[in-house]
A protein has these predicted regions:
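Flexible coil/turn and secondary-structure edge motifs
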Residues: 2, 19-198
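Bacterial N-terminal signal peptides
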Residues: 3-14
């Protein structure tokens, strides 16, 4: 009886860390949120991704009504497995940070790149990562904004995990939009570094 109780308690306490992990958040705007979500779901240490809107004028934005908002992805990650700095490096190398008018075939502010820092430590790390990315690209001016994170609003359910729900449409869109080709043009051998299977 005591052995059974001890075993049950051991199993219960070893299960706690999995459900009560130490997690942190990162928020990146990198053009179409379907693509950013797909890319970061492949990064080890990322626990979840959520497509949404951030930085605009209205509460509860929708795809049809999100003035001033950018499409963005909120990333929940385990800092014991992946650092914020590694996420930043992967982010910069998965977009064209020199383009201030949008990303790839998607044009306009809502598709422009930004890092929304959650706290001062992330703000400093993001500024450093932007500087390092600019140097890696030969000292060019980067258009990616680095700003404190306001409220993040999750997008409609049909946008979540779009690449798994509609794989053919997603692959067609990503290819036709020229995302991967442009990232390779900008970054060369560093393109998509840190993102598995890319």
């Amino acid at each position: 009886m005591l052995r059974t109780l001890a075993l049950a308690l051991t199993l219960a306490f070893t299960a706690i860390p999995a459900s009560a992990q130490n997690t942190e958040r990162a928020v990146f705007a990198g053009g179409c949120f379907w693509c950013v979500e797909s890319d970061f779901d492949k990064v080890g240490g990322v626990i979840s991704t959520t497509s949404g809107y951030i930085g605009g004028q209205n509460a509860n934005p929708t795809y049809e009504n999100h003035p001033g908002h950018r499409e963005a992805v909120e990333i929940v990650y385990d800092p014991g497995r992946v650092s914020y700095e590694a996420l930043l490096s992967a982010f910069f190398r998965s977009v064209d940070p020199t383009d201030g008018g949008g990303q790839f075939c998607d044009r306009g502010h809502e598709y422009s790149t930004a890092v929304y820092a959650v706290g001062n430590a992330q703000l400093a790390a993001a500024r450093n990562a932007k500087s390092e990315a600019a140097q890696a690209l030969g000292g060019v001016q980067l258009a990616t904004e680095i700003v404190p994170a306001p409220q993040f609003w999750p997008a409609e359910e049909y946008h979540q995990d779009y690449y798994t729900k509609n794989p053919l449409r997603y692959r067609y869109y990503r290819s036709a939009c020229g995302r991967d080709n442009r990232v390779r043009e900008v970054w060369g051998s560093e393109a998509m570094a840190g993102i598995k299977g890319s």
